[in-house]
C-alpha cells in the first residue's frame, strides 16, 4: 500500500518589509505553530507532519529564519508582529490552537493576551516561563556570548537552505536579554489569557554535562514553572526527560 500523503499549500505573508513563507496542510481543527529562535519549519518538519494527521496545520518561518527574508529588526516586538501578520492574513474557519516553541511560546502568550477570543487554546513547548532569575546575567554573559557566536558561525554553512538563520551572535544575545525582561512580567500576560493552556517542558533544559551552571539554569527553569502554576493552577503541565531541543528530538 502506498504511503498516505498530505496535500500542502504554500503562501507568502508580506508585512513590515518582510516576506514570511507559510505552509498549510492537514485536516481537522486549525492549529498554528510558531517556531522558536534559531528554529525553522524544516527543523520542525517531523513535528509538523505528525500534527497534520489531526489538524489543519499552519507553519511558518520567523524573519531571518529559513526562507523568510532578513530584516532590520530582530526584537521581540518584531517577531510578535510576524506571528500577528500570519494569524491576520491566513484565513481560518475558526480560532486555532496556537502552539509555540521556545521564543514562539512567549510570542503565543503575548498574542493571546492581546487578542481575546482569537485563539482556541495555547500549547506552550519549553518557553514562556516566568523564571525567577534572568538567564543572561553576570558571569554567564561571556559564556552565552561565545556559545551564540559559535552558533552564528555554524549557521553560515546553512545559507541558502531551508534551515538557514541570518541572525548574528550579537543579535541572538540581545534578543535573549530582551526575552529575560519579557519573562519577568509574563505572569501578568497569563492572567489575561482566558483559554485552555497546556505546557510541555524539558526536565533538563540546559542539557547534560554542563556542570553547576547548567544545574542552576535547570533549577531556575523548574522554579519558573512552579511559580506559574501557583498563579494558574489550571494549566496542564507535562515534563519530558529531555533538553531544550525537545521539539526536534521528542516529536513522536
Report residues per predicted region.
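Post-His helix in hydrolase/transferase enzymes
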Residues: 248-252
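Active-site loop/oxyanion-hole signature of alpha/beta-hydrolase fold enzymes
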Residues: 23, 58-99, 141
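Conserved HGGG/HGGXW glycine-rich cap/lid loop of the alpha/beta-hydrolase fold
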Residues: 18-69
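Active-site loop signature of alpha/beta-hydrolase-fold enzymes
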Residues: 39-40, 65, 130, 207, ...
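Conserved hydrolase catalytic core segment
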Residues: 94-136
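Alpha/beta-hydrolase fold catalytic core
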Residues: 1-31, 52-55, 92-93, 120, ...
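Alpha/beta-hydrolase-fold catalytic nucleophile elbow
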Residues: 61, 125-126, 200
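Conserved serine/cysteine hydrolase catalytic core
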Residues: 161-241, 247
Amino acid at each position: 500500500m502506498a504511503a498516505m500523503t498530505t496535500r500542502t499549500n504554500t503562501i507568502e505573508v508580506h508585512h513590515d518589509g518582510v516576506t514570511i513563507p507559510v505552509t498549510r496542510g492537514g485536516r481537522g481543527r486549525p492549529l498554528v505553530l510558531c517556531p522558536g529562535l534559531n528554529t525553522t519549519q524544516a527543523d520542525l518538519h517531523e513535528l509538523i507532519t505528525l500534527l497534520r494527521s489531526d489538524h489543519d496545520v499552519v507553519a511558518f518561518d520567523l524573519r531571518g529564519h529559513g526562507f523568510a527574508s532578513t530584516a532590520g529588526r530582530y526584537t521581540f516586538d518584531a517577531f510578535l508582529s510576524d506571528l500577528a501578520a500570519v494569524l491576520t492574513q491566513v484565513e481560518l474557519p475558526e480560532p486555532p490552537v496556537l502552539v509555540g516553541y521556545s521564543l514562539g511560546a512567549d510570542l503565543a502568550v503575548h498574542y493571546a493576551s492581546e487578542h481575546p477570543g482569537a485563539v482556541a487554546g495555547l500549547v506552550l513547548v519549553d518557553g514562556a516561563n516566568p523564571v525567577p532569575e534572568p538567564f543572561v546575567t553576570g558571569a554567564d554573559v561571556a559564556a552565552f556570548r561565545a556559545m551564540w557566536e559559535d552558533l552564528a558561525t555554524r549557521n553560515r554553512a546553512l545559507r541558502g537552505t531551508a534551515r538557514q538563520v541570518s541572525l548574528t551572535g550579537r543579535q541572538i544575545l540581545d534578543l535573549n536579554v530582551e526575552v529575560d525582561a519579557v519573562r519577568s512580567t509574563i505572569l501578568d500576560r497569563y492572567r489575561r489569557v482566558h483559554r485552555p493552556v497546556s505546557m510541555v517542558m524539558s526536565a533538563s533544559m540546559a542539557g547534560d554535562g554542563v556542570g553547576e551552571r547548567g544545574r542552576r539554569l535547570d533549577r531556575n527553569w523548574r522554579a519558573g514553572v512552579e511559580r506559574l502554576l501557583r498563579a494558574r493552577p489550571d494549566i496542564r503541565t507535562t515534563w519530558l526527560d529531555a533538553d531544550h531541543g525537545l521539539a526536534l528530538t521528542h516529536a513522536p
